[in-house]
Amino acid sequence: MATAAAAQTGERRTPRSARGATTRGAILDAAQELFVSPGYRATSLRDIAAAVGLSHQGVRRHFDSKDEILLAVVERFGSVDLDDPADVSEGLGIVAIAERNAERPGYLELFSALAGEAAVASHPAHERMRARYVELLNLSTDWLAWSQSEGMIGAGRDLRAEALRLAAAWDGLQLLQLYLPGPVQVVPALAQHETLLACPPGSGAAAGPPPDAPAPLPALDLEPEEDAVEGYAKGRERRGRIIADATRLFATEGYGDTSMRDVAERVGVSKSTLFHHFASKEDLLGAVLTARDAQISDAVTLAAAGSARELLETLADGARSNAADEPGLVEVYAVLSCEATASDHPAHAYFQRRYARTLDTFTAVFEAAQADGDLPPHRDPVHEAAWLVALWDGLQIQWMYDRTLDVGAHLAAHVADVLPPRA
């Protein structure tokens, strides 16, 4: 804090400098809210000035650019904050950190929105966020190593991989809580995961062969909505090209900072032609999301799986296929799901419905796995469903900062831990 900094350095605070610090704080408060919704790209310096009640030049007296304001907002929350594990009174300490984060106004909203928006390499906070993930991974690995030496982490766990998956699932849980604050809560989920980490990997394997008749799988409820389009083939082809180019723009520039003029210029058509196919940018966004769901392979066909175990073990293949064959669709989903956490975003209801359906479906899948004896009795199907969805989304976000990350390999390792081979 500015006051604390002045006290520590012995700097004498004058009335003018105090007023300046207060104004800077007000600018950062307003910017933080605007960077969450409508988002960094869609927010101008004039928007920030209006929110604070200053002129454009009044803001420029404190910050030279919007980029400088963004970095100041990010630094406000500091670097990765991990206590010395030896000072933690109970457990691994991750629950205490999550509780502390939950008490920081705007933390959840800002970092969830920024994690997706800054994933694009051209974003001014990209390098800071990428470095933050590296810093978090290194510190968390050391933290888990100390915890394992104290008997709080099961023997045989790959600590660096566990640290990476923990950070990814944590990001995903924060995102889920913003869409489904009732069913998903970050702190209890982390507390339950902490108890599971105390067991060796693959604990609780069932003895004997699998059942002759596996438990029935739930009806798939992840299908995209219809986007029925009539008309001539040329018109349908142009509509498809518009959706494809809009997908690329939304993935790289975000929805908020992409205009219909931008889309028209990318496609090479007039705005009137664009509006002939889509009445508004919201309609175009809906078509992009529908096309994404229709093309990507994360909506696994349950009918093709013979059992819950088989279904869950094939998820890694789908993730690898998505990253290799449809990286743009993975990108647009990651960016938009983070951007749309604000309730007034046009895509908020879409992601809220989709997450609710996905959690219900995977809860039923894990219940079937438990009925088959594949999911150990000490694991809760509701928790496992939320953790899997959060992990997958968090891994995709991290993949956008590090394209060498193998999302499929981490999903496979997680499923192997949750569904151990039969003894």
What is each model feature region?
Residues 1-12, 97, 101, 134-138, ...:
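C-terminal peripheral helix-coil segments that are non-catalytic and often amphipathic
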Residues 4-6, 110-112, 156-176, 186-196, ...:
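Hydrophobic alpha-helical segments that form the core
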Residues 22-26, 30-72, 238-241, 245-287:
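Helix-turn-helix
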Residues 72, 82-110, 159-163, 301-331, ...:
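Hydrophobic alpha-helical connector segments
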Residues 75-81, 290-297:
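Short, basic, alpha-helical segments at the C-terminal edge of helix-turn-helix-like DNA-binding modules
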Residues 103-127, 325-348:
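Amphipathic alpha-helical segments used for helix-helix packing
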Residues 105, 123-150, 345-372, 383:
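Amphipathic alpha-helical packing segments from all-alpha helical-bundle domains
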